[in-house]
Amino acid sequence: MNIVVIGPFYPYRGGISDTNKELCESLINNGHKVEIINFKLLYPKVLFPGKTQFQKITEKKNLKSYRIVNTLNPFSWIRVVKKINGLKADLIITTYWTGLLSPCYYFINKFVSNKVIKIGIIHNVISHEKRLIEKQLLKLYLKGLDKYVTLSKNVSNQIEKIYKKTNGIKLFHPLPTKFGVKENKIKSKKLLGLNIKDEYILFFGLIRKYKGLEILINSMPKILEINPNIKLLIVGENYISMKKYYQLIDKLNISSSIIIKNKFIDNDKIKYWFSSSELVVIPYSKASQSGITALSFQFEVPTVSSNIDGLKELISDNESGYLFNRSANELALKINYALSADRKNIINNIIRIKKELTWEKFINQILKNI
């Protein structure tokens, strides 16, 4: 098939861009011709909460893309329509996670030839920023699609409450292979400058209010009572002020047991943080699905996750990870239990589940349902 994929790609950074790259590489590896249409302007600076939207390092194996789409400029949308019609595409795939994209995506899907199948991969129903009229913008986007694909049952359920048409395909979050595989633990600790005698639990990714970092920090004193040599790694760029977290750490007198790497981690270093850790902690208050869970499975590190929709779909308590009910006390109990347990069975189950979460299976499921 001739397939056009529209979304953020290099030089844009982050999980959506990384996922789009793996999507295209997998389609190409399965014999499809793929053209990539990238954003020239994605977020206006005033709406972007982070330090930069762009990668600081050059991708070694970069896919060619046409940087055309400007979310604020309808003339760029017309250029995209002309480009796609000229490519004689069989299928368009757009990737959606925020209502800001709805007008341009709807326009493109509406005015591209009716012979082209339009599919949307939906990461979030409502963006993390919870902007006004987001549900209406989602409906607009969905009206332009022949089929939509979700990465979790949770997202499918949310869409069905808003939009009654039954043209959805519920799939899964494919595991990200581009970041490599699990590395030797001692080697990883040395490379990151960590003490090889200590054990580490990891909080990884963008720091936002809903991600529950405060609960994790509050759980640390009880964790340290049982596991005095454990260290908490807080690794990721903040999208909110870090002041309250530093104040809480000082108040609890646990600064010697916490290491904060407050920056966006380059792709080639991600595997070392996961490979250094005994557990990955995901104490979110809400989740569509979690790219961090997918990373943890890729690197075969057990997770301790909130028992909420979007996370518990992939995690079975004491089988493929650990679940807790979002209190600092219960989180401490669960982490202490996990640290004392023989986690070989958990890891073996993760390895088994990994085989079902491949890009090839993801793509095959989409194409057989269109």
Segments from the language model and where they lie:
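Acidic donor-binding loop of glycosyltransferase active sites
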Residues: 272-288, 301
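Conserved acidic donor-binding segment of nucleotide-sugar-dependent glycosyltransferases
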Residues: 317-318, 322-328, 335-342
